[in-house]
Amino acid sequence: MKPTENSTGSAYPHPLDAILLAGTDTNARRLIKGQNKAFLELGGVALVRRVVEALIQADSIGQVFVVGPKLELEVVLSGLPSEVVVVEQAGQMLGNTWAAIHAAESRYFARHGVHDPDRPMLFTSCDLPLISARAVDDFVNRCAVEDDKVEHNYAILGGVAVEASLKSYYPRYGWDGILRPYVHFKNGLARLANIYVGRPRKLAHQDFLQTGFSYRKAKDWHNVVLLTWSFFKQAGGFRAAWLTIRYQATLMASRRGGWLYR
């Protein structure tokens, strides 16, 4: 049973609905041997089920809405509690997200008789093999603390992993490992952690989300050009395109010990 009162010490009075993205990518090159990564198995358990189990064990989470290929998801998620709701995918990432949001909003309205556009939700992806209920609760609590500091709650708060927390997964001593691209800040390197708390009804420029996701591998110059050009074609996109160009130029200049700066 999920608590109806806040037992986590956060500013959120009730558990959050979670939106879990497990859609099959329309770009075949992003599939893994032709397969949706949600269904890859680790220790005999599909990745998507691992994430769902962590979410339903978290005190900060109420219902879990999983969006993706419904028939396949219902098979790998069979036997889980009624708090888990499977939603048929609608297309690209943004369309899938809204399909799950609409399902969550409809269920909330059926139970409470009102809509609440300020209600926060948790958003995450299906490919987080190391996720745990404790980590989810910690993240939600941190977001609640940040929300509590401001007069108007944030539209979205994103999880960030700093380089120091990921170094133990680097290849070393002849073992295989994982190397991922980072965003370069003045005080260090960091990357988004594919987990967010947001209020989707308050989020502006949502087309930017799909554009950024489609061309997110910004270390590839082909994607950088496509990303910049796509921003130019969207309302309000000139500033986003200009910041993208500046960031890429700065990153290029910082390589090889920053010799271009000297």
Language-model segments: residues:
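N-terminal nucleotide-binding beta1-loop-alpha1 segment
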Residues: M1-G34
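Alpha-helix termini
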Residues: S7-G9, I56, A104-P117, C143-H152
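Short, acidic, metal-binding catalytic loop of nucleotide-sugar glycosyltransferases
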Residues: A54-I61
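Short, polar loop motifs at secondary-structure junctions
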Residues: G68-L73
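Short phosphate-binding loop-to-helix
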Residues: S78-P120, L130-I131, D137-D138
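Conserved core of the sugar-phosphate nucleotidyltransferase
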Residues: S132-R262
